[in-house]
């Protein structure tokens, strides 16, 4: 049941993340895949695998096979993003997934969660910054931290509260 739930969740995350990535980046196709080590993901198949490996697991003092070994595989145009994605592509993937998670929370509980973007904008070019800000524009209460306040102009920042820490003192920017 856990594997099926994870697969269903990753399917939804894949769909929404792919849309977000296409909007932010507009280039490659993002695909998320759930990878399990179980050949048979039925309850009986998983139980069978645990029974088969029980003595070995006791001897080794660890569970060798299990859902803890499952993984999320990320691809850009069918290439393993972990091996081939640039730092900018990796940042865009993470942001796409984060925004997708915000949308999933909204779908599940009916309201947006608070979003924290911790120094992520400094690594984006102007176009990607603006697209990210468009995605969260007035929908999501967002805290953006940065060491360099260079967000550029975006209408969603017109009514933003900007706080600056300068020499240990918190100041409000006007």
PLM ranges: what are they?
Residues 145-148:
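H-loop/switch region of ABC-family ATPase nucleotide-binding domains
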Residues 165-167:
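Active-site donor-binding loop signature of nucleotide-sugar glycosyltransferases
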Residues 143, 161-163:
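Hydrophobic/aromatic beta-strand patches that form the interior of the parallel beta-sheet core
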Residues 118-120:
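Walker B catalytic acidic pair
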Residues 1-114, 123, 127, 131-134, ...:
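Conserved NTPase motor "head" modules and their coupling/switch loops across ABC/AAA+ ATPases, GTPases
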